[in-house]
């Protein structure tokens, strides 16, 4: 595995961690809160964003306009059953979600969840590092590279891993600050 390939794989992990963070609720309305919501529509689990237009008219409201009015009750049910803790208001054509201010306890829960998501990202980085180091050791064993080259490559792999681990820590700090801001 080349260092450029290693960086590319680790960057994908950073992006996946960022997407996970985006699904965590902060005090503001955001369409990305609904990214994980799937709706049972004609017997198939369908992502909400492919069934409806989602907008945020203000900082505390999410407006959902299904393309098919027949799916209103399905969308409403999916949101009610989700772990978002939001109550949908169905007016016959649209669904409004009012985002109440987060309680201190809920904010602390979300910070813990963000920490778990960050740890999952770090585990993924360590797995990528392990695979890269295994490749280097195989090359050394097959006499494709010298012991010194192997050690140098392993050091480079560790430096890249440390760099990306720091990026995840920075993303976590930003998200924690965002969650705890009242």
Swiss-Prot record:
GO biological process: translational termination
Entry-linked SUPFAM superfamilies: Ribosome recycling factor, RRF
Protein task: Responsible for the release of ribosomes from messenger RNA at the termination of protein biosynthesis. May increase the efficiency of translation by recycling ribosomes from one round of translation to another.
Disulphide bridges: none
Gene Ontology cellular-component annotations: cytoplasm
Organism superkingdom: Bacteria
Pfam family, one: RRF
Name under which the protein is recorded: Ribosome-recycling factor
Chief subcellular location: cytoplasm
Similarity section: Belongs to the RRF family.
Places the protein is found: Cytoplasm
Native organism taxonomy: Bacteria, Bacillati, Cyanobacteriota, Cyanophyceae, Oscillatoriophycideae
Gene assigned in the entry: frr
InterPro entries on file: Ribosome_recyc_fac, Ribosome_recyc_fac_dom, RRF_sf
GO terms, molecular function: ribosomal large subunit binding
Keywords (A to Z) from UniProt: Cytoplasm, Protein biosynthesis
Species annotation: Picosynechococcus sp. (strain ATCC 27264 / PCC 7002 / PR-6) (Agmenellum quadruplicatum)
């Amino acid at each position: 595995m080349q260092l450029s390939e290693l960086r590319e794989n680790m960057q994908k992990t950073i992006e996946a961690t960022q997407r996970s963070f985006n699904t965590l609720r902060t005090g503001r309305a955001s369409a990305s809160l609904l990214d994980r919501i799937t709706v049972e529509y004609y017997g198939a689990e369908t992502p909400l964003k492919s069934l409806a237009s989602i907008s945020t008219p203000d900082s505390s409201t999410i407006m959902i306009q299904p393309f098919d009015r027949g799916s209103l009750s399905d969308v409403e049910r999916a949101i009610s059953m989700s772990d978002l803790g939001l109550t949908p208001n169905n007016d016959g054509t649209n669904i409004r979600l009012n985002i109440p201010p987060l309680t201190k306890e809920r904010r602390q829960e979300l910070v813990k969840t963000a920490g778990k998501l960050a740890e999952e990202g770090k585990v993924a980085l360590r797995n990528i590092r392990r695979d890269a180091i295994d490749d280097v050791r195989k090359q050394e064993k097959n006499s494709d590279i010298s012991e010194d080259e192997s050690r140098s490559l392993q050091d480079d792999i560790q430096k890249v891993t440390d760099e990306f681990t720091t990026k995840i820590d920075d993303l976590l700090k930003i998200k924690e600050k965002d969650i705890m801001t009242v």
